[in-house]
Amino acid sequence: MFTLKKSLLLLFFLGTINLSLCQEERNADEEERRDERNVEVEKRILPFVAGVAAEMMQHVYCAASKKC
């Protein structure tokens, strides 16, 4: 009976360590995915912002030079 308890305790301990390592790996993977999403959002937003800024500069130049 004592040997069985030792074996079960050892299995429980090893399983707990294994689960904690998996959790750390999962957290690292989720962090990488969040970084990738931020880069994707930046890639989509930057051209839009650049286009709006260019158009505003044209309007400002047109109003300042009064050539429109």
Swiss-Prot record:
UniProt cross-references to InterPro entries, sorted A to Z: Antimicrobial_frog_1, Frog_antimicrobial_propeptide
Signal sequence range: 1-22
SS bonds (residue pairs): 62-68
Proregion positions: 23-42
Keyword Signal found: yes
Major location category of this protein: secreted
Superkingdom of the organism of origin: Eukaryota
Entry's Gene Ontology cellular component terms: extracellular region
Record's keyword annotation contains Repeat: no
Swiss-Prot/TrEMBL keywords: Amphibian defense peptide, Antimicrobial, Cleavage on pair of basic residues, Disulfide bond, Secreted, Signal
Tissue: Expressed by the skin glands.
Record's subcellular location: Secreted
A Pfam family hit: FSAP_sig_propep
GO BP term, pick one: defense response to Gram-positive bacterium
Described function: Antimicrobial peptide.
Family: Belongs to the frog skin active peptide (FSAP) family. Brevinin subfamily.
Protein name, UniProt field: Lividin-1
Lineage: Eukaryota, Metazoa, Chordata, Craniata, Vertebrata
